[in-house]
């Protein structure tokens, strides 16, 4: 009956004036709606109701598209006006600032797309953790094993599908409900920004995928042990076939393939597209409302992200263990990350961000031509050229396309090589990181606090080892999340890589054992709390009476007089020792009238008020997040853009630049952020302040670099170097990062068998040069030298052996 009804509808659509593509879309949506109802046999009345529902949804999509177009135009015009006003002398820098921020002392110069993405992500994570604590299931979530996670997943699916919950354990039910409800909250937030994402059970955890597992499906599924080795091989074709064979029985085929004609060929093409997209990491690209995961609006387009609907939660859980985020927790945080990046992008650039940014650039260029500023117009034109303009390297960072894979084998083995080199060379990174204390104090000085107080704050936090539970919660609501949760420590010294599960876990363990995890987390936590206390102390001061330094700090993030005089009146957080801290979460408690007043609009819908409140909160959170990574230097999107130039992993140029940039992310971040912060005073007309800032940065780096260098010498059993010697002073500046150029072994000396050029080019080429030297010795008959060099090369590239405490014992 159902097939006859659908055939009749199809015939009517063919005879109507509706375009073929649109007619097929309507029919596909009816089929999908049929699958969603879980009813096998449909009569004409039910099919008619489904058709009515589909038509209503398509009418809603039309309204959403119109609203998106209107709101996009407002964002575009506002951004154009902002760039022309604040960056009148350098509009190209203004466009870069929109994407990745700028050090120039302009209103909102740090409130970039990249920072909005980070702020939304952290806000989502912090809000989720608060929900876990509120429902007293945070410990269960943190310690859940595979069996518990499977049962939690069942609850998530049952809640999402509005069916009876079968789980008997109350805590597991509570945890499942919290995740399901929070998933819905995030999905609705997507839709607030212009998406039309359908309700899916477990939507937030469905977006994770491991391209390395997919590409090795034969091995992952252990097929070689089950069949003749000649029959099963690891070719790309066999891997995709193995993946299809595994996933197809687990899929709700009516729902998954609703936008196809259902033929075996169409299903096969659908799965081919999905597989190829996943192994290239294309599902991690954020591209706005229409193409977001689960979006209805572009479901019929070839480029839309494929949604794989599973029959049951167990089917999803089994698949995820093999080819997804491995476990529920990792899949959940992957989903949070994608949500934060997409929402942050849309909040700044609208529902079609890539297209809208180019339109912004074009409008800026046109206005400059009208203003007879031809030179600036040409620079802007070059910057916004598609595929080759200067903006590409920054856009690739914020939309994630730089992390897509174009050449799987090259990306995999190059990433593994760089991971091994990191774990073989960074064992003493925490000793070298002593210079962080100086950089920390310089940032506090820039904020308007004292340098000596900054040194004391950093050392005091390191000496404390661990904060009280209450202060940890306060730091968390300001956006602090420990690096052992977000796993970004490796990116501090390199451009970051996509790694398979095993190497990712090994690398996490390494950074815990070398002490860098504790060091970085402690200083970040201290920077957050210190700044939170500093801002709270200013709350009784009206905007016009603020110190120039503090006013400069907040205006960098678009916090003007109107905003400051509202947020300073909010309640503060109080720790057990009586200290007061600014409360970012209290922004959620601001009344709708206050939000409307800040927006300057009296008539706002509930959705618009929610968006305005979210944007205010993430702007304030962004201030704490951004400045904490100036205090504890980390490469931001701007730094990574210059290091990778938007080049994809797996390509020749992409891998070459990644090898070259290994271990250079941190020193380049010092140049871009710490030095750039001081040089920004030049553009602001304060030349003497710029000179003093640079001089203090370099001299302080030399002092702390000498301390670090001496500590490493003592660990090696050497005497401290003469501080008066010119070479020592120069080495100390390098060690402390004052000149902004690290050698690849964190200022180790260049080996005799390698060239300076190879060392500058990166550790990969350095080690390759050493291997070449071995063969060179062999051809000359100098076998003892070849053996010695071979021994050194092996010893120096064994992961974990160079941990500073192990290396001291090993060398001894």
Indicate where each model-derived feature is located.
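Hydrophobic, often aromatic-rich secondary-structure segments at membrane interfaces
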Residues: 312-431, 435-729
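Long, charge-dense tracts
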Residues: 175-180, 208, 216-344
């Amino acid at each position: 009956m159902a097939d006859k009804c659908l055939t009749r509808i199809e015939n009517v659509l063919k005879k109507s004036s509706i375009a073929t593509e649109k007619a097929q879309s309507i029919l596909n949506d009816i089929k999908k709606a049929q699958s969603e109802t879980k009813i096998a046999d449909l009569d004409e009345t039910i099919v008619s109701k489904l058709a009515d529902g589909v038509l209503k949804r398509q009418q809603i999509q039309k309204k959403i598209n119109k609203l998106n177009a209107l709101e996009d135009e407002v964002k575009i015009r506002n951004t154009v006006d902002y760039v022309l006003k604040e960056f009148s002398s350098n509009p190209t820098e203004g466009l870069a600032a929109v994407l990745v921020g700028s050090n120039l002392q302009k209103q909102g110069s740090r409130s970039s797309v990249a920072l909005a993405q980070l702020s939304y992500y952290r806000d989502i994570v912090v809000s989720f953790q608060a929900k876990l604590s509120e429902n007293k299931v945070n410990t269960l979530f943190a310690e859940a094993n595979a069996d518990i996670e499977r049962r939690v997943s069942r609850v998530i699916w049952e809640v999402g599908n509005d069916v009876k919950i079968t789980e008997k354990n109350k805590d597991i039910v509570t945890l499942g409900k919290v995740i399901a409800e929070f998933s819905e909250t995030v999905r609705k937030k997507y839709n607030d920004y212009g998406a039309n994402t359908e309700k899916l059970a477990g939507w937030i955890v469905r977006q994770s995928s491991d391209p390395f597992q997919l590409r090795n499906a034969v091995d992952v599924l252990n097929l070689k042990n089950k069949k003749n080795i000649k029959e099963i091989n690891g070719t790309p074709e066999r891997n995709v076939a193995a993946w299809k064979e595994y996933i197809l029985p687990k899929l709700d085929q009516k729902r998954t393939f609703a936008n196809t004609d259902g033929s075996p060929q169409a299903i096969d093409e659908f799965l081919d597209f999905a597989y190829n997209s996943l192994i290239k990491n294309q599902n991690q690209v954020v591209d706005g409302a229409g193409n977001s995961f689960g979006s209805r609006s572009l479901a019929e387009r070839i480029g839309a992200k494929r949604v794989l609907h599973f029959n049951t939660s167990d089917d999803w859980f089994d698949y995820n263990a093999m080819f997804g985020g491995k476990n529920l927790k990792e899949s959940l945080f992957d989903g949070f990350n994608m949500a934060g990046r997409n929402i942050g992008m849309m909040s700044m650039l609208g529902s079609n961000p890539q297209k809208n940014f180019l339109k912004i650039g074009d409008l800026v260029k046109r206005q400059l031509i009208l203003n007879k500023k031809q030179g600036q117009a040409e620079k802007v034109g070059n910057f916004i050229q598609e595929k080759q303009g200067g903006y590409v390297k920054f856009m690739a960072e914020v939309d994630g396309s730089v992390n897509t894979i174009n050449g799987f084998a090259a990306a995999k083995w190059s990433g593994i090589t760089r991971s091994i080199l990191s774990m073989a060379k960074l064992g003493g990174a925490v000793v070298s990181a002593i210079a962080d204390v100086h950089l920390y104090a310089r940032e506090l000085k820039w904020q308007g606090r004292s340098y000596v107080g900054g040194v004391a704050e950093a050392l005091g936090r390191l000496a404390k080892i661990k904060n009280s539970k209450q202060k940890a919660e306060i730091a968390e609501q300001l956006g602090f999340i420990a690096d052992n949760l977000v796993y970004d420590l490796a990116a501090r010294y390199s451009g970051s890589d996509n790694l398979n599960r095993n190497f990712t876990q090994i690398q996490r363990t390494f950074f815990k054992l070398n002490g860098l995890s504790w060091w970085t987390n402690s200083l970040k936590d201290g920077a957050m709390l210190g700044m939170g206390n500093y801002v709270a102390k200013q709350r009784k001061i009206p905007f016009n009476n603020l110190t120039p330094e503090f006013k400069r700090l907040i205006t960098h993030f678009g916090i003007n007089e109107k905003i400051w005089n509202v947020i300073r009146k909010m309640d503060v957080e109080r720790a057990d020792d009586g200290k007061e801290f600014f409360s970012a979460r209290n922004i959620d408690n601001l009344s709708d009238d206050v939000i409307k007043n800040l927006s300057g609009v009296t008539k706002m819908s509930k959705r618009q008020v929610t968006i305005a409140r979210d944007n205010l909160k993430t702007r304030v959170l962004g201030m704490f997040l951004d400045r904490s990574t100036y205090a504890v230097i980390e490469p931001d999107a701007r730094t990574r853009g210059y290091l990778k130039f938007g080049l994809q992993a797996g390509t020749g140029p992409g891998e070459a630049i990644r090898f070259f940039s290994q271990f250079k992310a941190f020193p380049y971040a010092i140049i871009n952020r710490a030095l750039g912060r001081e040089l920004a005073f030049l553009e602001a007309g304060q030349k003497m302040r710029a000179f003093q800032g640079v001089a203090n940065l370099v001299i302080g780096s030399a002092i702390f670099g000498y301390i670090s260098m001496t500590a490493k010498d003592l660990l090696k059993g050497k005497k401290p170097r003469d501080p008066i010697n010119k070479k020592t002073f120069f080495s100390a500046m390098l060690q402390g990062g004052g000149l902004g150029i690290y050698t690849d072994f964190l200022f180790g000396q260049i080996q005799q068998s390698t060239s300076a050029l190879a060392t500058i080019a990166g550790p990969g080429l350095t080690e390759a040069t050493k291997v070449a030297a071995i063969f060179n010795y062999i051809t000359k008959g100098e076998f003892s030298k070849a053996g010695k060099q071979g021994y050194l090369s092996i010893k120096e590239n064994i992961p974990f052996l160079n941990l500073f405490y192990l290396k001291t014992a090993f060398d001894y």
